[in-house]
């Protein structure tokens, strides 16, 4: 006699989890690399603020890559320094405001934003995707638009989808301001 339906489903889920885990890095391996990148980037004169983002900031057990966010008015200068970081073994992509490198056997992604959009970008790039969707839906219900650039009051705007920065910006310098604009307390990354 074969497996029952529930047992078969559990086996399928465990196999899928194992396959996904193979393509991902353990937090214990990825976090030290993220902290090294953070120390390096945070020490640059052109950097106003730097934070780990993504699943590492949310303290997930595994991560697909290392995400670091920087606030700076000098994006290209920061990108050049990041590509030249001593841990970098390969540059996968480098533009004016984002770059991806291989370091420590992992992909490390850097995003550089202007300082007054840092809070919005930190919230957005920390995720999770489901959390961000829920926040955007809450914003829409309040005639607001929420994205990685801030929260915008789009009441009275003919086409709120006409661009990323449409309407009057009401939040975005800090993460707390993003949640406050939606009448929510700041949600810790681990709960997102």
Regions found by a protein language model. Give the residues of each.
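Catalytic cores of large soluble enzymes that bind and process phosphate-bearing ligands
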Residues: 3, 7, 22-33, 70-71, ...
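Acidic, metal-coordinating catalytic segment for phosphate/diphosphate chemistry
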Residues: 76, 80-192
